Amino acid sequence: MVLFFQIMVWCIVAGLGLYVYATWRFEAKVKEKMSAIRKTWYLLFVLGAMVYWTYEPTSLFTHWERYLIVAVSFALIDAFIFLSAYVKKLAGSELETDTREILEENNEMLHMYLNRLKTYQYLLKNEPIHVYYGSIDAYAEGIDKLLKTYADKMNLTASLCHYSTQADKDRLTEHMDDPADVQTRLDRKDVYYDQYGKVVLIPFTIETQNYVIKLTSDSIVTEFDYLLFTSLTSIYDLVLPIEEEGEG
């Protein structure tokens, strides 16, 4: 029994060391899995307590303070290591989560949104919108070129992809983690966001033909970008009648 718990303690210490190393090397991925990591951490406590209780059933009543000490130790490690908490008031032992990093990330996101919005406004005022009409393919070509022009200025990649046949659907989703799930969402006309925030797929229909607007980025693509680029398609429609009247 003693040997078992000694091995378990050293495994936990090794696991904590691995966690610290992973945080240095793969900080973003570790943050994504933080909820699962913390659940695993407390599961280890429960398993250890159950093993000890199995061999010493009366210990829960005669040595309950041992359970309490270990539980507090797990909670403190969770607070200081996993939640990056620090002591705010030494006398009151008050703990709070360090939110500085979160605020910095939010500030960066805000600046990114503002820069993209400014670029969007500048392009609308200074870049001509060339309209293609006469057929569905011509209209789609015009939309595709418009999206690519704006995306290039915003450090994004945009394309209008065919999505009518099963071959089109398979081609679009072949590199996705779960192609069937992505296709199901797009068939329901739901916007798809990948779990890493790098890809957004937006269902788009031109008369009887189905398309998907694909937005990708090396940094992040959000609902904000989805709204900007879908508004471009509406602007394109507003310009189209003017061009047609001019031809008449």
Curated annotation (Swiss-Prot):
<keyword id="KW-1133">Transmembrane helix</keyword>
<keyword id="KW-0812">Transmembrane</keyword>
<keyword id="KW-1003">Cell membrane</keyword>
<keyword id="KW-1277">Toxin-antitoxin system</keyword>
<protein>
    <recommendedName>
        <fullName>Stage II sporulation protein SA</fullName>
    </recommendedName>
</protein>
<dbReference type="GO" id="GO:0030435">
    <property type="term" value="P:sporulation resulting in formation of a cellular spore"/>
</dbReference>
<feature type="topological domain" description="Extracellular">
    <location>
        <begin position="1"/>
        <end position="3"/>
    </location>
</feature>
<feature type="topological domain" description="Cytoplasmic">
    <location>
        <begin position="22"/>
        <end position="41"/>
    </location>
</feature>
<comment type="function">
    <text>Toxic component of a type II toxin-antitoxin (TA) system. Its toxic activity is neutralized by cognate antitoxin SpoIISB. Expression in the absence of SpoIISB permits sporulation to stage II, when plasmolysis zones and holes in the peptidoglycan layer are observed, resulting in cell death. Lethal when synthesized during vegetative growth in the absence of SpoIISB. In E.coli both the membrane bound and soluble domain are required in cis for toxin activity.</text>
</comment>
<feature type="transmembrane region" description="Helical">
    <location>
        <begin position="68"/>
        <end position="87"/>
    </location>
</feature>
<feature type="topological domain" description="Extracellular">
    <location>
        <begin position="65"/>
        <end position="67"/>
    </location>
</feature>
<dbReference type="GO" id="GO:0005886">
    <property type="term" value="C:plasma membrane"/>
</dbReference>
<feature type="transmembrane region" description="Helical">
    <location>
        <begin position="42"/>
        <end position="64"/>
    </location>
</feature>
<feature type="topological domain" description="Cytoplasmic">
    <location>
        <begin position="88"/>
        <end position="248"/>
    </location>
</feature>
<dbReference type="Pfam" id="PF14171">
    <property type="entry name" value="SpoIISA_toxin"/>
</dbReference>
<comment type="subunit">
    <text>Probably forms an oligomer; X-ray data suggests the inactive complex forms a heterotetramer of SpoIISA(2)-SpoIISB(2), which inactivates the toxic activity of SpoIISA.</text>
</comment>
<dbReference type="InterPro" id="IPR025940">
    <property type="entry name" value="SpoIISA_toxin"/>
</dbReference>
<keyword id="KW-0472">Membrane</keyword>
<comment type="similarity">
    <text>Belongs to the SpoIISA toxin family.</text>
</comment>
<keyword id="KW-0749">Sporulation</keyword>
<feature type="transmembrane region" description="Helical">
    <location>
        <begin position="4"/>
        <end position="21"/>
    </location>
</feature>
